[in-house]
Swiss-Prot record:
It is a multi-pass membrane protein. Belongs to the ligand-gated ion channel (TC 1.A.9) family. Acetylcholine receptor (TC 1.A.9.1) subfamily. This is Neuronal acetylcholine receptor subunit non-alpha-3. Keywords: Cell membrane, Disulfide bond, Glycoprotein, Ion channel, Ion transport, Ligand-gated ion channel, Membrane, Postsynaptic cell membrane, Receptor, Signal, Synapse, Transmembrane, Transmembrane helix, Transport. Retina, tectum and brain. Residues 29-235 are extracellular. GO terms for cellular component: postsynaptic membrane. The chain crosses the membrane at residues 236-260, 268-285, 302-323, 439-456. GO terms for molecular function: acetylcholine-gated monoatomic cation-selective channel activity; transmembrane signaling receptor activity. InterPro entries: Neur_chan_lig-bd, Neur_chan_lig-bd_sf, Neur_channel, Neuro-gated_channel_TM_sf, Neuro_actylchol_rec, Neurotrans-gated_channel_TM, Neurotransmitter_ion_chnl_CS, Nicotinic_acetylcholine_rcpt. Glycans are attached at N54, N141, N169, N208. After binding acetylcholine, the AChR responds by an extensive change in conformation that affects all subunits and leads to opening of an ion-conducting channel across the plasma membrane.
Length: 466
């Protein structure tokens, strides 16, 4: 009897173990599958997960930037690659980890759960939501963390006053598209944008990126939003090397126009070439910066200054060339004050050599003293009597010949003096042109240096202050 009872107990234990054994070896995947089926049985993703009608879902919002792709000054756009950190609580997605093998979190497709419709308000390409619907992390207490990546083109008002030493303040405003503040509230996860994985941009540097919560009212409703402000600083090395330095070189080439001699036409040729080069630079800048009538960019002001500078240099060069080619033959006599100022005083002030090619030649007498004495003696002899009449006739012939020679010498002398006077006038005007060149050289050099300093100093001061 005892043996039968023992056998019966053994069979019962084996049967019980056979029935209970599968429940002890349930895999984690099966448990997670059971959890998902239990959680989403009857779950409606279009319904806001609240218990009471006056409950508000608080969404903790944060931003992480990975790349500043582009800042388009022409179209007022900023292109960024970011991650949107969103965290909220869904009471319908809670479970007890002990009932499901200690599972504390699961990953579910974001398309299957309720999502706060947070979008970028200043979007410029029509893509207001994140570009990729990634999975969301759901914890056992109902906390949901969703960090979708997104590529945004946001509108940004550009201030190019100090281009290329400018800074830009671009903002990204996020908020719910349909829910007001009584339904969905936004709070900042962090006051700063996460830049730990930021990939540096070759043209722009992010000085600061902070977030701030705000709210706008529309009638009786209040709509909370979060604004992230990016302070961007341009790295001006490229524009300095390929834009500003060539412009500086062209401005100083304009100054060197007044160092060239006026005999040839290189002065006008150089000035015209500089003006054409500046026009090309202006067209290049026009393709970069936005077309705005509110402000003139710094580099645009400088190019405009140089173009006016070059235009004046061309006008002055024409005047100097005109002075250089003046003479008595062109009916331009030199006034006494011009001689005194430009031939004597200004050359000393400008450290120039004096005008030494100006000589005074004594007048040649019509008759030399010896000729006068010979003629006087001949006249006395002819008056004293008739002796030596033949000799006297010979002397008179020589006297007549000498008088003709004297008249010829006088004619040659007058011609030489006239040529010398013309040459002297020509040289005087050429020297006046040289003095004018030296004056305008210093004037334009001073104006170029002062203009460059006055235009770029405010921008450099602002750029170097941080």
């Amino acid at each position: 009897m005892k043996l039968q009872i023992s056998g019966l107990l053994l069979v019962t234990a084996v049967a019980y173990a056979t029935i209970e054994a599968p429940e002890e070896f349930v895999s984690l995947a099966e448990m997670e599958d059971t959890l998902l089926r239990n959680l989403f049985r009857g779950y409606q993703k279009w319904v806001r997960p609240i218990l009471h009608a006056n409950d508000t879902i608080t969404v903790r919002f944060g931003l992480k930037i990975s790349q500043l792709v582009d800042v388009d000054e022409k179209n007022h756009l900023m292109t960024t690659n970011v991650w949107l950190w969103q965290e909220w609580t869904d009471y319908k997605l809670r479970w007890n980890p002990e009932d499901y093998g200690g599972i504390t979190s699961i990953r579910v497709p974001s398309e299957t759960i309720w999502l706060p419709d947070i979008v970028l308000y200043e979007n410029a390409d029509g893509r207001f939501e994140g570009s990729l619907m990634t999975k969301a992390i759901v914890r056992f207490n109902g906390t949901i963390m969703w960090t979708p990546p997104a590529s945004y083109k946001s509108s940004c008002t550009m201030d190019v006053t100090f281009f290329p030493f400018d800074r830009q303040n671009c903002s990204m405003k996020f908020g719910s598209w349909t829910y007001d503040g009584t339904m969905v509230d936004l709070t900042l996860l962090d006051a700063y944008v996460d830049r730990k994985d930021f990939f540096d941009n070759g043209e722009w540097e992010i000085l600061n990126a902070t977030g701030q919560r705000g709210s706008r009212r529309d009638g009786i409703y209040s709509y909370p939003y979060v604004t992230y402000s990016f302070i961007l600083k341009r790295l001006p090395l490229f524009y300095t090397l390929f834009l500003i330095i060539p412009c500086l070189g062209l401005s100083f080439l304009t100054v060197l126009v007044f160092y060239l001699p006026s005999d040839e036409g290189e002065k006008l040729l150089l000035s015209t070439s500089v003006l054409v080069s500046l026009t090309v630079f202006l067209l290049v800048i026009e393709e970069i910066i936005p077309s705005s009538s509110k402000v003139i960019p710094l580099i645009g002001e400088y190019l405009l200054f140089i173009m006016i500078f070059v235009t004046f240099s061309i006008i002055v060069t024409l005047f100097v060339i005109n002075v250089h080619h003046r003479s008595s033959a062109t009916y331009h006599p030199m006034a006494p004050w011009v001689k005194s100022l430009f031939l004597q005083r200004l050359p000393r002030l400008l450290c120039m050599r004096g005008h030494t090619d100006r000589y005074q030649y004594p007048d040649i007498e019509l008759r030399s003293p010896e000729l006068k004495r010979g003629m006087k003696k001949g006249q006395q002899k002819s008056a004293g009597g008739g002796r030596g009449g033949l000799k006297e006739d010979e002397n008179q012939a020589w006297i007549a010949l000498l008088e003709k020679a004297t008249h010829s010498v006088h004619y040659i002398s007058r011609h030489i003096k006239k040529e010398h006077f013309i040459r002297e006038v020509v040289q005087d005007w050429k020297f006046v042109a040289q003095v004018l060149d030296r004056i305008f050289l210093w004037v334009f050099l001073t104006a170029s240096v002062l203009g460059t300093i006055l235009i770029f100093t405010p921008a450099l001061h602002m750029y170097l202050s941080t």
